[in-house]
């Protein structure tokens, strides 16, 4: 049994990480 809340938190964290990396990449460029 998977916990939907934990899954949602993981997805939100993953998206936040991707957004952060994208911003850093734009700043470097």
Curated annotation (Swiss-Prot):
Q: Report the transmembrane regions from the record.
A: 10-28
Which factors induce or repress this protein, as stated in its UniProt record? Expressed in both exponential and stationary phase; expression is considerably higher during stationary phase (at protein level).
Classify the protein's membrane topology as the record does: Single-pass membrane protein
Other comment: Encoded in the Qin prophage.
Could you state one GO cellular component term attached to this entry? plasma membrane
Give any Pfam family that matches.
YnfS
Question: What is this protein identified as?
Answer: Protein YnfS
Disulfide bonding pattern of the chain: none
Ordered alphabetically, the record's keywords are: Cell inner membrane, Cell membrane, Membrane, Transmembrane, Transmembrane helix
Q: Where in the cell is it found?
A: Cell inner membrane
